[in-house]
């Protein structure tokens, strides 16, 4: 039970942080449009994204909501039923779930996602905290899978 409560609390914390930052962006950043954060490196720029990453699938809100919900249910299943005792995998899935739900809340309530981080040193999409959580979580998840494969190969070669 502690396993479930801890992971639920972690997911809720990520969602809360995401929603608080987005609330700040709407109230403070939207009226001014943009402001420097780290000069010549990062600016805070208010953008409403009607699609997913890079505005892909803009105008397909129902599809995005259904597809995202299905993916998040699969991630939640993996977190709560398949990752006991695997802390790195749990961390990865908590990040993906928290970030995914944060953006899903925006999409369901507003039809678009609030983005606000703009990298000035490279041409890239404006993104948000939830996007960072999802990307770091997926990268960590890939690392976990890779490490599991390496461990399985080592175990198999030692048994031969």
Give, region by region, the residue ranges found by the protein language model.
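Alpha-helical transmembrane bundles and membrane-interface segments of multipass inner-membrane proteins
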Residues: 1-160
């Amino acid at each position: 039970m502690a396993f479930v409560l801890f992971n639920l609390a972690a997911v809720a914390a990520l969602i809360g942080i995401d929603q608080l930052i987005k609330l700040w962006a709407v109230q403070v950043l939207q009226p001014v449009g943009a402001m420097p954060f780290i000069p010549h490196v990062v600016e805070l720029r208010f953008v409403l994204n009607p699609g997913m990453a890079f505005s892909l699938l803009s105008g397909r809100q129902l599809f995005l909501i259904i597809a995202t919900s299905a993916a998040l249910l699969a991630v939640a299943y993996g977190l709560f039923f398949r990752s006991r005792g695997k802390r790195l995998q749990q961390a990865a899935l908590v990040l993906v779930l928290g970030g995914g739900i944060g953006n899903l809340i925006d999409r369901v309530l507003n039809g678009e996602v609030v983005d606000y981080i703009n990298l000035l040193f490279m041409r890239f999409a404006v993104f948000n905290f939830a996007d960072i959580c999802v990307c770091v979580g997926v990268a960590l998840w890939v690392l976990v899978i890779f490490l599991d494969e390496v461990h399985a190969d080592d175990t198999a070669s030692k048994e031969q």
